[in-house]
């Protein structure tokens, strides 16, 4: 994996092949009522595994993984309690790439309280390139 590959020209190939794409969901994203483990506990477990493997970061792109890690639920996919988002966990930080306007007040507080920053999905490309340049 080369950081330079991410730093090249940005394109939006879906715009070319799916010009009539429907708008992204604005349905609310809510906090789970009774999760088995807290967000902080899950982040600690992931960071422990990262340290064991010598990893600088973990990028979660599977919607169910993002939902599980954050204890959040949505309704972007029929019959699945997931939402469109990505999660980048580094040793000292974490970023949730999601439209923050969709988070309920309770969900926003829980995410911030766990030390996860909410970041616009439009910045994902740059964030991954920066992480790669840092060796993450």
Language-model features and meaning:
Residues 1-136:
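Terminal domain-start leader segments
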């Amino acid at each position: 994996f080369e950081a330079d590959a991410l730093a090249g020209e940005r394109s939006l190939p879906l715009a070319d092949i799916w010009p009539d794409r429907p708008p992204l969901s604005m349905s609310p994203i809510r906090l789970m009522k009774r999760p088995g483990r807290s967000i902080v506990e899950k982040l600690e477990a992931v960071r422990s595994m990262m340290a064991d493997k010598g990893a600088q970061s973990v990028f979660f792109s599977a919607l169910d993984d993002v939902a599980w890690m954050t204890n959040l639920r949505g309704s972007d996919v029929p019959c699945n309690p997931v939402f469109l988002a990505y999660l980048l966990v580094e040793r000292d930080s974490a970023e949730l790439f999601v439209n923050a306007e969709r988070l309920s007040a309770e969900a926003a507080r829980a995410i911030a309280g766990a030390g996860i920053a909410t970041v616009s999905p439009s910045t994902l490309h740059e964030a991954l390139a920066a992480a790669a340049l840092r060796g993450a």
